[in-house]
């Protein structure tokens, strides 16, 4: 089996899934102290990169997604599946795990 190179342009979420680029955290505090990875909290904010078509209701009608690429979102802390593509980190979430759009 040939290896497939994964990148953002080749990853299309299915159903009501959303691909979110995780926001980078500060490497040091306001006082100038560098933080080790173990001291950093898991981020809950990111930018929507790709969205699936939506999900179907009981009658089979497609319910479109409320999100679009470029939206900045707040999501549940332990939701989704983290994916590393190149040097960037992403999380693949269900739409229900997105708590709010940040404006």
From Swiss-Prot:
<dbReference type="Pfam" id="PF00166">
    <property type="entry name" value="Cpn10"/>
</dbReference>
<keyword id="KW-0143">Chaperone</keyword>
<dbReference type="GO" id="GO:0046872">
    <property type="term" value="F:metal ion binding"/>
</dbReference>
<dbReference type="InterPro" id="IPR011032">
    <property type="entry name" value="GroES-like_sf"/>
</dbReference>
<dbReference type="GO" id="GO:0051082">
    <property type="term" value="F:unfolded protein binding"/>
</dbReference>
<protein>
    <recommendedName>
        <fullName>Co-chaperonin GroES</fullName>
    </recommendedName>
</protein>
<dbReference type="GO" id="GO:0051087">
    <property type="term" value="F:protein-folding chaperone binding"/>
</dbReference>
<dbReference type="InterPro" id="IPR037124">
    <property type="entry name" value="Chaperonin_GroES_sf"/>
</dbReference>
<comment type="subunit">
    <text>Heptamer of 7 subunits arranged in a ring. Interacts with the chaperonin GroEL.</text>
</comment>
<dbReference type="GO" id="GO:0005524">
    <property type="term" value="F:ATP binding"/>
</dbReference>
<dbReference type="GO" id="GO:0044183">
    <property type="term" value="F:protein folding chaperone"/>
</dbReference>
<dbReference type="InterPro" id="IPR020818">
    <property type="entry name" value="Chaperonin_GroES"/>
</dbReference>
<comment type="similarity">
    <text>Belongs to the GroES chaperonin family.</text>
</comment>
<dbReference type="GO" id="GO:0051085">
    <property type="term" value="P:chaperone cofactor-dependent protein refolding"/>
</dbReference>
<keyword id="KW-0963">Cytoplasm</keyword>
<dbReference type="GO" id="GO:0005737">
    <property type="term" value="C:cytoplasm"/>
</dbReference>
<comment type="function">
    <text>Together with the chaperonin GroEL, plays an essential role in assisting protein folding. The GroEL-GroES system forms a nano-cage that allows encapsulation of the non-native substrate proteins and provides a physical environment optimized to promote and accelerate protein folding. GroES binds to the apical surface of the GroEL ring, thereby capping the opening of the GroEL channel.</text>
</comment>
<dbReference type="InterPro" id="IPR018369">
    <property type="entry name" value="Chaprnonin_Cpn10_CS"/>
</dbReference>
